[in-house]
Amino acid sequence: MPELPEVETVARGLAQVWDGRTLVRVECRRPDLRKPLPPRFAERLTGRRIERVGRRAKYLVVGLDDGLVLLGHLGMSGRMVISQGRNEPPGRHDHVEFITDHGISVTYCDPRRFGLLDLCGRDELSAHPLLAGLGPEPLEAGFSAEMLAACLAGRRSPIKVALLDQTLVAGLGNIYVSESLFRAGIAPTRPADSLKAAEIGRLVPAIRDVLTEAIAAGGSTLRDHVRPDGELGYFQHSFAVYDRAGEACPGCTCDIAGSSGIQRIVQAGRSTFFCAHRQR
C-alpha cells in the first residue's frame, strides 16, 4: 500500500497538470470501488476549477473552486496516470477518467479496486470519517520529539507497531518505519514507552530524513507504485534494512555468519526488518 512518500509524489505530479485547471469532463466506467462513488460524482466535478492538489496522511486531497473536495486513496494497486490527448480505448482497470481544459487526461486505474474516491465540503474535511482522528504530519514543523514523547507515553506496544498507528503519526507505513528505526538505532520490539528522551530525539529527525529522501526519489516501487508521469520510484535502491533479510546492513560490523545479518520478524501481521547488532 502506498505510504506517505508515494502519495506525496502522486500529489506533486498531479499538481503540475491540475492546479488552476478546469475539469471539462469526468467519465466513470466502474463505480463499485472499495466504496461506491458518491451520487452525481461526474456531474458535481464537471466544470469545476481545481485550486490545489495536496495530501493528508495517505490520502490525496484535491480542493475545488466551489468548496468541494475530491478525496482519494490509492488502496493496494491504484494509480493516477497522466496522458496528453489520449486516443486509445480505456483498459479494463481504468475506472475513472478526468479530462481538463488543456487536454490532459488523468486516469484512475486500480486492478484490485481497494482504492476509493469521495467528495465532501471543505468545511467538513477534518471531520470526514477517513481523516478524523489522524495524528500529526511527520514533515510539519509541529512534529517534535516532545510531541512524539507525549504520544508514546503509556503505550506498551512495540515501537514499530505504535508508529504504524495512524492516530499517533499520520502517513507512516511498514517500509519507512523500519528504515527510520534503523537510522535511529532503536529495536522495533522495544515497548514504545520505554524509549528515552535521547532516543526519541534521534527518532524524529530519522523519520523526517527518511521521508524527505524517499519523496526526492519518487517513493519506492516494489510492485504497483508508479508516478503519474509513468516513472518508477527509486528509493527501494536505498533501503538499509527493508526487504533485505540475511544481508549486511550498511556499515555493519557484525559477524554475518553468526548473526544471519538483517533479521525479519512479523509484528501485527506485517514484516519487520532490523539489525539486532545496531538496533537496541
Regions found by a protein language model. Give the residues of each.
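Basic, nucleic-acid-binding surfaces and adjacent catalytic neighborhoods in DNA/RNA-processing proteins
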Residues: 22-40, 54, 149-280
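Glycine-centered flexibility motif
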Residues: 36, 47, 57, 78, ...
